[in-house]
UniProtKB/Swiss-Prot annotation:
The keyword Nucleus applies. It comes from the Eukaryota. CDD domains: F-box_AtSKIP3-like (cd22162). SUPFAM superfamilies: F-box domain. This is F-box protein PP2-B1. Residues 29-75 form the F-box domain. It is found in: Nucleus. It comes from Arabidopsis thaliana (Mouse-ear cress). The gene is PP2B1. One of its GO terms (biological process) is protein ubiquitination. PROSITE patterns: FBOX. GO terms for cellular component: nucleus. Component of SCF(ASK-cullin-F-box) E3 ubiquitin ligase complexes, which may mediate the ubiquitination and subsequent proteasomal degradation of target proteins. Residues 9-18 have a biased composition (Gly residues). Part of a SCF (ASK-cullin-F-box) protein ligase complex. Interacts with SKP1A/ASK1 and SPK1B/ASK2.
Length: 336
């Protein structure tokens, strides 16, 4: 397909070589353009949505073929008809595709959100907080279920105060696109712009196939500026800095906690397997939890048929609060 788009990108700035390459490209484009439209559509349908948009610029006849329902139905998920309103039946398949790419659809009683990646047509999901297993999530003293207008879902989970932080989720491999590398993110924000207890102590994230050893990493919900780190290292609401060294020496477990914090700080400074948050265009933040691959058989290489995701901090005993979790997002890994 490269020959359709123009001359040799490695050629010099001018001269006979460039003209020769352009002539070859035009000739080959003309030959492709001379094919019957349904034949052109068949070829394009085996590429990607991005490629279809690119080749549409070759000529009017190729554009017509590239925008045909034959092409865009191949890019749509097989279950698309159940995901769109009946009022959308008059739309072309390309318009339906773009609608699913630009606007996510709530599925499974509003507990999941579905859309397709515009460039590839790959399936994407967000598991709402209601779909996750949150330890103490049904105890109002620890977690509160609230409504926020900027969320995709009816309810999100607000962390009030816990020392045992554990969130888990699962998704079936069959719901995702085959032959695809996926990345997993937790989507969150902080209550009143601030959380407590997540600055010095990392959270352990795990992603893997059920029944297999998960790939783990340390993640932070806070960006990690020095002022925030020094102000909010808490144990039961008491700043660690307020506890004397002599007092800690009489309680070895507190010394271990401090050593773990210093080790994590060293990892963060060295840029090791520690990941921080990034802001999203929708006003939320996200942290990457891990990656996995769905093979061409629609499952893991070991035959597993379900992905499990975990986010935990249960070792240090420090109190944590102020986090609002919208859900866990699973989308194709971005290629560079």
């Amino acid at each position: 397909m490269e020959q359709i788009h123009g001359g040799d990108s490695n050629s010099g700035g001018g001269g006979g070589g460039s003209s020769r390459n352009d002539e070859i490209s035009v000739t080959r484009a003309s030959r492709f353009d001379a094919l019957p439209e349904d034949c052109i559509s068949k070829v394009i349908s085996h590429t990607s949505p991005r490629d279809a948009c690119v080749v549409a610029s070759v000529s009017k006849s190729v554009k017509s073929a590239a925008q045909s329902d034959l092409v865009w139905e191949m890019f749509l998920p097989s279950e698309y008809s159940s995901l769109v309103l009946q009022s959308a039946n008059h739309l072309s398949k390309k318009e339906i595709f773009l609608s699913l790419a630009d606007n996510s659809v709530l599925v499974e009683n509003g507990k999941k959100s579905f859309w397709v990646e515009k460039a590839s047509g790959k399936k994407c999901y967000m598991l709402s907080a209601m779909e996750l297993t949150i330890i103490w999530g049904d105890s109002p003293a620890y977690w509160k279920w609230i409504t926020v207008p900027e969320s995709k879902f009816e309810k999100v989970a607000e962390l009030r105060n816990v020392c045992w932080f554990e969130v888990r989720g699962k998704i079936s491999c069959g719901m995702l696109s085959k032959g695809t590398h996926y990345s997993v993110y937790v989507v969150f924000k902080t209550a009143n712009g601030r959380s407590y207890g997540f600055d010095l102590v990392p959270v352990e994230a795990g992603v893997g196939f059920v029944g297999k050893v998960a790939t783990k990493k340390s993640v932070y919900f806070e960006s990690g500026n020095a002022d925030s780190r020094s102000a909010t290292s808490h144990y039961s609401g008491i700043s660690y800095a307020m506890v004397s060294r002599a007092f800690r020496m009489r309680r070895p477990w507190m010394q271990v906690q401090r050593e773990e914090e210093e080790e994590v700080e060293g990892e963060r400074e060295r840029g090791m397997n520690v990941v921080g948050p990034k802001e999203r265009v929708d006003g939320w933040s996200e942290v990457e939890l891990g990656k996995f691959y769905i093979n061409n058989g629609g499952c893991g290489d070991d035959g597993s048929d379900e992905i499990e995701i975990s986010i935990m901090e249960t070792q240090n005993g420090n109190w944590k609060s102020g986090l609002i979790i919208q859900g866990i997002e699973i989308r194709p890994e971005r290629s560079n």
